[in-house]
Amino acid sequence: MKLSTYNFLTSVAIKGVKVGFPLKLTINKKEVVESEFNPTFVERILPKLDWSAVYGAAQVAELTEDIPAVQPENIVENELLLQKLHHLLFEIDVLEGQLECPETGRVFPISDGIPNMLLNEDEV
Amino acid sequence: MHVEETQQKVNKAKKADKKQRRCLAIIKSDCEVSPSAEPTPYLAVLNVGLSNGLTEECLLTEAAATGGKVIQVVMLPGKSYCFFICASLEDSQLIYEGMHNISTIGQQGAVAYLSYIRQLPALAGKSEWNKPLPRGLHIIADFVTEEEESTLLRAIGEDGRTSEGTGSLKHRNVKHFGFEFLYGTNNVDPSKPLEQSIPSACDILWPRLNSFASTWDWSSPDQLTVNEYEPGHGIPPHVDTHSAFLDPILSLSLQSDVVMDFRRGDDQVQVRLPRRSLLIMSGEARYDWTHGIRPKHIDVVPSASGGLTTQARGKRTSLTFRRLRKGPCDCSYPALCDTQQTKVPQELHASLAAQAITLEQQNVHEVYDKIADHFSETRHTPWPQVSEFLDSFEPQSVVLDIGCGNGKYLSCNPLLLSVGCDRAQGLLAVGRRKGQNVFRCDCLVVPVRSSSIDGCISIAVIHHLATKERRLAALQEMARVLRPGGRALVYVWAKDQRKNDKKSTYLRQNKAVNKERTTEQQQRQKQHQELEQQLSNNNPLPVHTNRTEFQQQDVLVPWKTKDEQKTTYLRYYHVFEEQELENLVSQVHEVQLIKSYYDQGNHCAIFEKISKNSL
Ligand SMILES: [Zn+2]
């Protein structure tokens, strides 16, 4: 699972959960899959992402030195930051780990790079 | 050297003669055959037959290689010999010279010995012709005189409505009286009687049927279809649509004899229809047997002495008389009954609702998990209009494929951020191996932030949901994740696999039917029998026959695995009627339908989430 995908996932469907986002991420095993850096791509994707989950992902991936807690305003001119975001969002691939609902603690395992977000009938 | 070679040839020929005589002697002890030194159209293959594992296909291939034309192969069960009926003396000679002592079709590549024979043995005709007729089938010979025949031909020659010569009709001329028989739907439109009713010249026929008619649904017909068959023309096996016509159906043969095939499952009976005879198909013969005529120039028929002989076809005109039913069929032969096959009982909806989750679990999720790899192999080419939809997004749009399967649409447009989800772990793993972004979830509960996605596709997914409420919920879930202004594309399987009389790819792949080697009805009946043996009988729903038209909306579609076990899995589908998808979309909150279309057997819809500003 790429951390760009992580940015969209929520546990809001669980009965009683109000926000369910961001999910608490644990990485047990990851790899870095290099891909071509395209500053425009990162820049245009950013408005579709939730920065708190971008920063949260950076914390878990131990990249907080690269990614600020608050989204800077003039990000377009900051190519270095765009490159670091590219690395964080599109190159880090979580192979094993888990996602956890921030409200109920329900755990969604990630194995072989695929998060299992399937809920039981009685959970929704 | 040269001399030696010649000597070898002579020896070989002598050996063959000896063999030929010995084999003939063996056959003679079995049945009455007399060899002929002069060529005849009948050939015996003396030393190989069904008991040696020889197939008709193999024989025909060998014969075809000689350039000689075969009309029929006669193979007898348990015999180590068989026969050819050849199209002409020349053909017979070509085959004899090309195969005798040459063809290595015997056991372990042994060479075959052939001989001309005067006539086929009586035994040969038995298996094919001595079967009882299907129940309810009657043939009345000399039903009309030669004089009456000409009167009738004149009467129908003058008027009537001519069918458009398309499709399977291109082989023959067809005219209608009373009502037009529509070959596209195999039905009539009772609200559209033709100006020309059945010619009064036919009125002489009905009083002759008094002794039969007491048990029939009708005493005089109101619909007549006239078919003109040139030699070589035929009609694929079919049953006349139950709900279209009452019992029985009559067919008068004029101008020439023909052989008609009746089939029910694996049962097959050949019936000779002499010129000027009347065929009555009633009861079982009308409802449960298909009938057809093979496209041949020459028929093989029983000879006077009990063997087989050939009979050249002439131009034949058939008059099929029927009476419209104008209502559902109430026969007791459900296998080929359109009424009983298409009936959706009220209870079905209730039971689908009650069992939706179990049904989807057993007949969708579990099946896809089991067939994932094989299924994935068959799903590699993106449908062009889906690709087109994906290309319509701005670069760097976020697109979610709900029910992405093996992820074939996730890499269509590399300028997008494509993410896919599915329930089937096996299919997700295929996509993941290709480096795609996938996660596992149910299409009714998509774990994605609301209003976060620019585009959404759902290709061949929601037709696996067992109730309307669940199908609607899946669309509503797509609407939820879309941002205002975001667009979604939905594909579902259409019940109607034809558009403007053109068959979908799904139907076109049914080669046997399209080449008129069999019919959908035949295949349904056959599958019905196969599945009865293979599967438990408590299937909650009717089982669809692949590559045929859908008979009902809620069906189980078989998937046969490619491995040696050839296990059949049944997948649940709800195939959509026209406008059904549009209606469903109209019930989704916050969206509007942009476009809907029919694409290769699917109903498709594009909808857009209404932006807050325009509300
Ligand atoms: Zn019926």
From Swiss-Prot, chain A:
Keywords: Cytoplasm, Nucleus. It is found in: Nucleus, Nucleoplasm; Cytoplasm, Perinuclear region. One of its GO terms (molecular function) is protein heterodimerization activity. It comes from the Eukaryota. One of its GO terms (biological process) is positive regulation of rRNA processing. GO terms for cellular component: cytoplasm; nucleoplasm; nucleus; perinuclear region of cytoplasm; tRNA (m2G10) methyltransferase complex. Residues 2-120 form the TRM112 domain. PANTHER family: MULTIFUNCTIONAL METHYLTRANSFERASE SUBUNIT TRM112-LIKE PROTEIN (PTHR12773:SF0), UPF0315 PROTEIN-RELATED (PTHR12773). Heterodimer with Mettl5. Acts as an activator of both RNA and protein methyltransferases. Together with methyltransferase Mettl5, specifically methylates the 6th position of adenine in 18S rRNA. Belongs to the TRM112 family. This is Multifunctional methyltransferase subunit TRM112-like protein.
